[in-house]
């Protein structure tokens, strides 16, 4: 039996501002943007070259969902962006104005730094040791 995680829902404030951030600042690919109703869209983005898992940008509806925007994991790192060249991507992200909240450091498993997305969700940029 083969299984994999296809999508991870990320609650956002606005579809278009989230698409702009992920495609322009992080250079993700917009995979799909399909209207489902007048207020709901099916929006998928993923890092270039990613084939199995993507982010489903889900607009927060109602007070409870909107209260989670930017803090879906209670202040813990939420997502992990793996790279094949840490320093290349770190410099590119700095040039794009990405805010790093923890500076790069070398760990037993590789090189890592923590950054925020446009809403404040925490991500690891990580290059694992071979």
Question: What is the role of each PLM region?
Answer:
Residues 14, 117-120:
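Conserved phosphate-binding and hydrolysis motifs of nucleotide-dependent enzymes
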Residues 1-6, 29-82, 90-118, 126-130:
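Vicinal oxygen chelate
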Residues 12-15, 36-38:
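Conserved beta-strand-loop-alpha-helix junction that forms the acyl-donor binding cleft
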Residues 14-15, 84-87:
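Helix N-cap motif at beta-to-alpha junctions
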């Amino acid at each position: 039996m083969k299984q994999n995680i296809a999508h991870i829902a990320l609650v956002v404030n606005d579809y278009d501002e989230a698409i702009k951030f992920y495609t322009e600042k992080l250079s993700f690919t917009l995979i799909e943007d399909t209207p489902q109703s007048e207020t709901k869209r099916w929006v998928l983005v993923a890092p270039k070259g990613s084939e199995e898992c993507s982010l489903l940008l889900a607009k927060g509806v109602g007070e409870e969902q909107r209260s989670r925007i930017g803090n879906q994991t209670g202040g813990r790192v939420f997502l992990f962006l793996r790279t094949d060249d840490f320093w290349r991507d770190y410099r590119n992200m700095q040039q794009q104005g990405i805010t790093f909240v923890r500076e790069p450091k070398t760990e037993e498993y590789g090189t890592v730094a923590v950054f925020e997305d446009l809403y404040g969700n925490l991500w690891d940029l990580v290059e694992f040791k071979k």
